[in-house]
């Protein structure tokens, strides 16, 4: 089962890298392409001699939602449905999980060799939250402002990949802090 989960996770990461690279190419009229998939990071990308790297992570509303999603997507894995209960403050739950997920990545020193070789990379956060709406970023900013982070300087920017009605939207997340 671990092999199936890993295969599913790699497909998910590859999808998010492709979605991100396609959008960056469109926005900036660039020609980035994936050179390698060392894992970690998920991809080494290059455009006209400029090389960078991409790390992908996922942020879900809560652990139960993540477990249900992964078990549903992974062939042969026993389904683990979310409990049938009222979810109070889903935006706040998602925002807290998002802040914890991003904090963990920003504080991870093991990305240092990639930063040193290619410069700061891109952190792509796959938003696994079906209720994401216009108020969600406000909750995310509040949760982020309340989070203490020892940023290792490994990422130049953070992008969100958010599911929309007819596809996905790539959003630059501006996470400026008052204390920075």
Explain the meaning of each model-derived region:
Residues 33-35, 44-47:
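Short secondary-structure boundary/capping segments within folded domains
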């Amino acid at each position: 089962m671990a092999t199936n989960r890993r295969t599913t996770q790699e497909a998910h990461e590859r999808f998010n890298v492709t979605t991100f690279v396609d959008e960056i190419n469109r926005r900036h009229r660039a020609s980035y392409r994936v050179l390698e998939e060392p894992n970690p990071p998920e991809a080494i990308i290059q455009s006209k001699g400029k090389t960078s790297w991409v790390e992908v992570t996922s942020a879900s509303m809560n652990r139960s939602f993540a477990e249900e999603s992964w078990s549903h997507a992974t062939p042969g894995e026993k389904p683990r449905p979310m409990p049938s209960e009222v979810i109070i403050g889903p935006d706040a739950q998602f925002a807290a999980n998002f802040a914890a997920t991003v904090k963990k990545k920003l504080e991870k020193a093991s990305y240092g060799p990639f930063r040193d070789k290619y410069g700061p990379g891109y952190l792509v956060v796959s938003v696994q939250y079906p209720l994401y709406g216009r108020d969600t970023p406000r909750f995310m900013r509040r949760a982020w402002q309340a989070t203490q982070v020892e940023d290792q300087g490994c990422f130049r920017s953070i992008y969100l990949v958010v599911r929309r009605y007819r596809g996905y939207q790539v959003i630059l997340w501006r996470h400026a802090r008052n204390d920075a």
